[in-house]
């Protein structure tokens, strides 16, 4: 893994890992943002 740094063809990271991280991170950020917003709106 030391000499294959300059070869982006070996590991296309932006296929599964990008969809997995953004597919789970965006709903969780929206969910936590909704909870914190509701706590300020009620009172």
Swiss-Prot record:
It is a single-pass membrane protein. InterPro entries: PSII_cyt_b559_bsu, PSII_cyt_b559_CS, PSII_cyt_b559_N. One of its GO terms (biological process) is photosynthetic electron transport chain. GO terms for molecular function: electron transfer activity; heme binding; iron ion binding. With its partner (PsbE) binds heme. PSII binds additional chlorophylls, carotenoids and specific lipids. It is found in: Plastid, Chloroplast thylakoid membrane. Its cofactor is heme b. Pfam families: Cytochrom_B559. Heme binds at residue 22. SUPFAM superfamilies: Cytochrome b559 subunits. The chain crosses the membrane at residues 18-34. Keywords: Chloroplast, Electron transport, Heme, Iron, Membrane, Metal-binding, Photosynthesis, Photosystem II, Plastid, Thylakoid, Transmembrane, Transmembrane helix, Transport. GO terms for cellular component: chloroplast thylakoid membrane; photosystem II reaction center. Belongs to the PsbE/PsbF family. HAMAP family: PSII_PsbF. This b-type cytochrome is tightly associated with the reaction center of photosystem II (PSII). PSII is a light-driven water:plastoquinone oxidoreductase that uses light energy to abstract electrons from H(2)O, generating O(2) and a proton gradient subsequently used for ATP formation. It consists of a core antenna complex that captures photons, and an electron transfer chain that converts photonic excitation into a charge separation. Heterodimer of an alpha subunit and a beta subunit. PSII is composed of 1 copy each of membrane proteins PsbA, PsbB, PsbC, PsbD, PsbE, PsbF, PsbH, PsbI, PsbJ, PsbK, PsbL, PsbM, PsbT, PsbX, PsbY, PsbZ, Psb30/Ycf12, at least 3 peripheral proteins of the oxygen-evolving complex and a large number of cofactors. It forms dimeric complexes. NCBIfam families: cyt_b559_beta. This is Cytochrome b559 subunit beta. It comes from Trieres chinensis (Marine centric diatom). The gene is psbF.
